[in-house]
């Protein structure tokens, strides 16, 4: 009798694997409750992706790599890389996307290097863009906090962390030592900003530069400016690098860049995106569609020829890009097929027509 009861109890008891799974789920639930959603997830799981609202990055490749379709609203994002790698282009593209959706954007230009004509070429409505050129780091971060607290701004870009020079350093003499001042300033500002950003549903993008650590024997000698606080407070960190120069008849017309998602608290990290940035035009949408179309077997490549639905669309990538530029309906269909395969929201035809109409009006005005 006693033996049969014990046998039945053993059969009813969950297996070791099941009990472990249950314990892990409870631990993950407790961690998320304590530290917030996205603090822990299974690396390869689609369920790890949160249903967060986003502002598209302006690059379909990058939206896919981010896993959620853009920059998460109410979070801090850091974009860093070497000079002339496309950091400002990436942020201006995001500003254009935010404005297209009726949002308000601000650009805190601590480097005093924003080119309005270039911003306009990337689709930024410069008449509606709020711009500030602060004198010191404290002023820049206070302006950022005031804008966030207004609850009316969708996207704020700070260019760049390296240019956020503390007031004491500006007012001091050239040879004075100001060790750790900027790191302290960033740490204090981010402690105040993080909670406010989440409540106001603003995306704050910090552009950062790369520096070399002296005396590093093992590992990467590269580091970003402004101390460690920004690394911790960011939900997304992007490392952008130029990988090759795009040439047309021996003339440089753009750069191909690779963006690594170094940190992502909204979806599994470590994904990469490669796309073209054309000089004076920005991120090449058609170039991305050709690359992604081939990758997802929507566009077929045989030798140098590209074809879509058995119809040849061009010999060489440039010809295929030109075909998609001249046939926006087909380009939209291909983009929506790519979006559908990557679980991103689809675009509607009306939006596409509206944006083309706006482009014509801008050309007429120019």
Curated annotation (Swiss-Prot):
MF terms (GO), sorted A to Z: ATP binding; ATP hydrolysis activity; ATP-dependent DNA damage sensor activity; damaged DNA binding; single-stranded DNA binding
Domain of life: Bacteria
Primary localisation category: cytoplasm
Gene3D superfamilies per the UniProt record, alphabetical: P-loop containing nucleotide triphosphate hydrolases
One Pfam family this sequence matches: RecA_C
Gene Ontology terms describing biological process: DNA recombination; DNA repair; SOS response
GO annotation, cellular component aspect: cytoplasm
Assigned keywords, A-Z: ATP-binding, Cytoplasm, DNA damage, DNA recombination, DNA repair, DNA-binding, Nucleotide-binding, SOS response
Subcellular localization(s) per the UniProt record: Cytoplasm
Keyword Isomerase (UniProt): no
Presence of keyword ATP-binding: yes
Residues bound to ATP: 81-88
Family to which this protein belongs: Belongs to the RecA family.
UniProt function note: Can catalyze the hydrolysis of ATP in the presence of single-stranded DNA, the ATP-dependent uptake of single-stranded DNA by duplex DNA, and the ATP-dependent hybridization of homologous single-stranded DNAs. It interacts with LexA causing its activation and leading to its autocatalytic cleavage.
Name the UniProt record assigns to this protein: Protein RecA
């Amino acid at each position: 009798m006693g033996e049969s009861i014990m046998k039945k109890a053993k059969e009813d008891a969950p297996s070791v694997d099941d009990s472990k799974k249950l314990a892990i789920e409870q631990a993950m639930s407790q961690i998320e409750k304590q530290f917030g959603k996205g603090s822990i997830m299974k690396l390869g799981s689609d369920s790890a992706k949160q249903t967060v609202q986003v502002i598209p990055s302006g690059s379909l490749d990058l939206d896919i790599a981010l896993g959620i379709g853009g920059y998460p609203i109410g979070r801090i994002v850091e974009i860093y890389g070497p000079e002339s790698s496309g950091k400002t282009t990436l942020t201006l593209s995001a500003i254009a996307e935010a404005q297209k959706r009726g949002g308000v954007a601000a650009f805190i230009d601590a480097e005093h290097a924003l080119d309005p004509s270039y911003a306009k070429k990337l689709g930024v409505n410069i008449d509606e863009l709020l711009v500030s050129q602060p004198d010191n780091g404290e002023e820049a971060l206070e302006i950022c906090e005031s804008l966030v607290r207004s609850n009316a701004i969708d996207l704020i870009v700070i260019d760049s962390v390296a240019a956020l020079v503390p007031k004491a350093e500006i007012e001091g003499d050239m040879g004075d030592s100001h060790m750790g001042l900027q790191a302290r300033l960033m740490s204090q500002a981010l402690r105040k900003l993080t909670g406010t950003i989440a409540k106001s549903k603003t995306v704050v993008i910090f552009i950062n530069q790369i520096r070399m650590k002296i005396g590093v024997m093992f590992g990467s000698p590269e580091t970003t400016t402004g101390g460690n606080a920004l690394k911790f407070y960011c939900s997304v960190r992007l490392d952008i690098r130029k990988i090759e120069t795009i040439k047309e008849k021996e003339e440089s017309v753009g750069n191909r860049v690779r963006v690594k998602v170094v940190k992502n608290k909204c979806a599994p990290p470590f994904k990469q995106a490669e796309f073209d940035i054309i000089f004076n035009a920005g991120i090449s949408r058609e170039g991305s569609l050709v690359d992604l179309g081939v990758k997802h077997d929507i566009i077929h490549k045989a030798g140098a020829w590209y074809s879509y639905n058995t119809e040849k669309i061009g010999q060489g990538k440039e010809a295929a890009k030109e075909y998609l530029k001249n046939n926006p309906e087909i380009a939209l269909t291909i983009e929506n097929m790519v979006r559908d395969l990557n679980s991103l929201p689809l675009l509607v035809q009306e939006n596409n027509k509206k944006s083309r109409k706006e482009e014509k009006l801008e050309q007429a005005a120019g």
